Curated annotation (Swiss-Prot):
Sorted UniProt keywords: DNA-binding, Nucleus, Repeat, Transcription, Transcription regulation
SMART domains: SANT (SM00717)
Tissue spec. comment: Mainly expressed in leaves and seedlings, and to a lower extent, in roots, stems and inflorescences. Isoform MYB48-1, isoform MYB48-3 and isoform MYB48-4 are present in all of these organs, but isoform MYB48-2 is confined to leaves.
Domain HTH myb-type: 4-56, 57-111
Residue ranges: DNA binding: 32-56, 84-107
Protein function: Transcription factor.
The name this protein goes by in its record: Transcription factor MYB48
Keyword field contains Transit peptide: no
Gene coding for it: MYB48
Subcellular location: Nucleus
An MF annotation (GO) of this entry: DNA-binding transcription factor activity
Length: 256
């Protein structure tokens, strides 16, 4: 009883680990109470065994468990429960304490996942997808509104109900018959006008007599002038000039 109270507790030092390894090589890993007495470590047999099995054994594996080892731990625990030493025998290089620590960590993570129904990653992805969808919809609406305001027609437009502005524009484009005839007259004037301009330019070089207006008054004046000329001619021949001509030029068949 006094001997147990004099045993040392707490963390192992490097000198204690070296001393324990040497005595285990001498006497094997079975007689832990004897090793604890003869080594002078002032440790219990149980403490020496746990130190050897969990930390100093040369066949121990270091590092994280592989996925195959984790799956085997879950299967064996479902079969045997919390019998960690028995489970450790099926996993060479893994200690019962290491297997127990892995199991507790696994159950703690599983409980945290149940308390948190929606993970931040999934919620962030959902928010991102919804924001992208909203941005795409707003962009399409803005582009459609800009095409309507600018009057452009998109390749994807399939017709449909026309706006009031387009119908009013078509009504404004309808012409009446008077407008059509007015446009024709205006076109005719524009066509004839260049010809008139050509002759006006040539008139600077050539002078033409003024033509009489083909009215009825001018026609009557010309008729009266013709009558006056006839009267002059008749009076002219009434003189002795014509007989004088006959006196000088007698016919060959006249006698004398």
């Amino acid at each position: 009883m006094m001997q147990e109270e004099g045993n040392r507790k707490g963390p192992w030092t490097e000198q204690e680990d070296i001393l324990l390894v040497n005595f285990v090589h001498l006497f094997g890993d079975r007689r832990w109470d004897f090793i604890a007495k003869v080594s002078g470590l002032n440790r219990t047999g149980k403490s020496c065994r746990l130190r050897w099995v969990n930390y100093l054994h040369p066949g121990l594996k270091r590092g994280k468990m592989t996925p195959q080892e984790e799956r085997l731990v879950l299967e064996l625990h479902a079969k045997w429960g919390n019998r960690w030493s028995k489970i450790a025998r099926k996993l060479p290089g893994r200690t019962d304490n290491e297997i127990k620590n892995y199991w507790r960590t696994h159950m703690r993570k599983k409980a945290q996942e149940k308390k948190r129904p929606v993970s931040p990653t999934s919620s962030f992805s959902n928010c991102s997808s919804s924001s992208v969808t909203t941005t795409t919809t707003n962009t399409q609406d803005t582009s459609c509104h800009s095409r309507k305001s600018s009057g452009e027609v998109s390749f994807y437009d399939t017709g449909g109900s026309r706006s009031t502005r387009e119908m009013n524009q078509e009504n404004e484009d309808v012409y009446s018959l008077d407008d059509i005839w007015r446009e024709i007259d205006h076109s005719a004037v524009n066509i004839i006008k260049p010809v008139k301009d050509i002759y006006s330019e040539q008139s600077h070089c050539l002078s033409y007599p003024n033509l009489a207006s083909p009215s009825w008054e001018s026609s009557l004046d010309s008729i009266w002038n013709m009558d006056a000329d006839k009267s002059k001619i008749s009076s002219y021949f009434a003189n002795d000039q014509f007989p004088f001509c006959f006196q000088h030029s007698r016919s060959p068949w006249s006698s004398g």
